Amino acid sequence: MTRKVPNIEQMSQIECGLCCCLSILHFYKSKETLLDLRRDIEKGRDGYSIGDLKQLLNKRNFDTGSYQVKDVNKISELPLPLIAFWDNQHYVVIYKVKKNKVYIMDPSKGYINYEF
């Protein structure tokens, strides 16, 4: 059975990426808080870039990579959990892919799944 990542609710519209990072950190038993992460990285007008999130996780000894997935069936080949840039506007954490469903933690909606 796949363990869920913690649900971290975003407090502002532009903190979805930061919340996804915190969810991954808590999944791996970190005790850091959202405030700790906010202090560690500057926020741009539109929130955080993929590069910002990678830098934040790399500082914490995470090995990060960036992938562009055009076929949703290929997600299951990637290491989970992962942070995904969803619909070109929002970050979510994908924590499980099973049969024809992808399971995500969305910082604005909580746990949801989509069929593909």
Feature-to-residue mapping (PLM):
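Conserved active-site-adjacent core of cysteine acyl-enzyme catalytic domains
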Residues: 1-116
